[in-house]
């Protein structure tokens, strides 16, 4: 049934009397909860929070892009896989840890994250992407401040910053 009152933005088209339900388009008897969704293949929420906390010097609300230093806050930017997992995923457990993540500004098509995804050589030199087969724990990353650091697997490191000053075998010695 169509009502006679015009739309709010002064259109002459009539307004439907009842809005369409959210379940339009689903097969009969199926709810939105039963639809198959794509499995989560990225970092876990805990790892994303650890990387964001590391980038915010202990406070995820103060997170900055680890490459350019722009302020991102709690919800800006994206966590980049430094060593890509590959199309079939990976069996290497290190690639799912905070040692393989960097918080970068932009999306996979823009900003620092876009540069890393496009395999920019400058991003490779600063450690924001590495070829497959590389151990991300052993290659340093150059932060926006110019500081050269290694990433801790647990996202915390010995001093709680998430960064190591030397390669893991050097720190352990």
PLM features per residue range, with description:
Residues 1-64, 69-73, 130-173:
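A boundary/linker detector
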Residues 36, 89-90, 108:
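Residue-level detector of alpha-helix boundaries and kinks
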Residues 61, 78, 99-101, 137:
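Residues that flank catalytic or metal-binding motifs in active/ligand-binding sites
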Residues 70-73, 95-125:
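Short Cys/His-centered divalent metal-binding micro-motifs
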Residues 78-84, 109-110:
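Histidine-centered catalytic micro-motifs
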Residues 81-89, 122-132:
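Short cysteine/histidine-rich metal-coordination sites, predominantly Zn2+-binding motifs
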Residues 83-101:
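Short linker/helix segments within small regulatory modules
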């Amino acid at each position: 049934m169509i009502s006679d009152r015009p739309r709010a933005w002064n259109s002459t088209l009539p307004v439907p009397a009842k809005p369409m339900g959210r379940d339009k388009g689903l097969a009969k008897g199926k709810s939105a909860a039963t639809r198959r969704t794509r499995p989560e293949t990225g970092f876990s929420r805990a790892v994303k929070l650890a990387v964001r906390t590391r980038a915010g010097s202990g406070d995820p609300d103060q997170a900055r892009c680890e490459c350019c230093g722009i302020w991102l806050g709690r919800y800006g930017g994206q966590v980049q896989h430094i060593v890509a997992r590959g199309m079939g995923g990976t069996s290497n457990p290190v690639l799912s840890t905070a040692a393989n993540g960097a918080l970068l500004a932009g999306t996979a098509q823009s900003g620092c994250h876009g540069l890393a995804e496009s395999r920019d050589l400058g991003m490779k030199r600063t450690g924001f992407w590495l070829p497959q087969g590389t151990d991300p724990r052993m290659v340093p990353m150059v932060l926006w401040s110019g500081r050269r650091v290694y990433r801790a697997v647990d996202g915390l490191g010995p001093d709680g910053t998430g960064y190591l000053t030397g390669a893991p075998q050097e720190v352990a010695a």
